[in-house]
């Protein structure tokens, strides 16, 4: 699976969808390569956030996409300038290339949404 996009646009989109994740949430972003775009989405107890950016030279991946730790992606994209290529193998291993630099990110399991249980207060009699 493959796509090319602008590194700054991808970084900004990643920051946007991850903006709703709180420190206690499972830090996970789902990336999917579509016919002409790259889709990004996150899920948490607060809800679901998603966006997409234009991409070229795409070879789409399965509809389910692949999951990654967002901070690893942001660390690389913060320093990248211009076009970045994303190559994903069948197991989800992601290779990002920009500015003659390469960065590999391993996939992770799907997000586990944390639910907060309200404590019951016992009445003192």
Residue map of PLM features:
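DNA polymerase processivity clamps
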Residues: 1-125
């Amino acid at each position: 699976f493959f796509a090319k996009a602008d590194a700054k646009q991808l970084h900004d989109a990643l920051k946007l969808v991850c903006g709703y994740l709180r420190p206690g949430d499972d830090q996970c972003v789902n990336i999917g390569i579509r016919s002409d775009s790259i889709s990004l989405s996150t899920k948490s107890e607060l809800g679901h956030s998603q966006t997409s950016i234009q991409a070229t030279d795409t070879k789409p991946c399965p509809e389910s996409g692949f999951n990654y730790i967002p901070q690893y992606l942001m660390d690389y994209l913060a320093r990248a300038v211009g076009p970045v290529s994303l190559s994903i193998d069948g197991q989800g291993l992601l290779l990002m290339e920009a500015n003659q630099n390469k960065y590999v990110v391993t996939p992770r399991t799907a997000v586990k949404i944390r639910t907060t249980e309200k404590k019951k207060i016992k009445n003192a009699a």
